[in-house]
């Protein structure tokens, strides 16, 4: 699981999700990538699930890059707790994703298998996304 080793503050505010990604919008490491088409908080479990889906489909001979990192804590209060008495404890770590951001990149010799692997990963994510190649831009 991806979580930060050390953070300055355990709890953070939750900003509004607006605007488009200013960086990380093109495929720079691999040949194919998954590009977000909307806003979302993607948890560390969802990132790991998508990574496993890609690796299981391509088996060997390819390389996967994860371009996002869950660095924001989301808090939650326990069930059946009255309102007040402070903010809840951190439950998940999420990555704040904006439209245009490339989430995963893949380098694999066979295009058909690479696209199928990325499609399986997209189904694991709570966001609309598309497959882009190195030549395409947002």
From Swiss-Prot:
Basic residues bias (residue ranges): 1-17
Keywords annotated in UniProt: Ribonucleoprotein, Ribosomal protein, RNA-binding, rRNA-binding, tRNA-binding
GO biological process: translation
Keyword rRNA-binding included in the entry's annotation: yes
Region (Disordered): 1-24
Annotated InterPro entries: Ribosomal_uL16, Ribosomal_uL16_bact-type, Ribosomal_uL16_CS, Ribosomal_uL16_dom, Ribosomal_uL16_sf
CDD domains linked: Ribosomal_L16_L10e (cd01433)
Entry's family note: Belongs to the universal ribosomal protein uL16 family.
Function per UniProt: Binds 23S rRNA and is also seen to make contacts with the A and possibly P site tRNAs.
Name under which the protein is recorded: Large ribosomal subunit protein uL16
Organism: Mycolicibacterium gilvum (strain PYR-GCK)
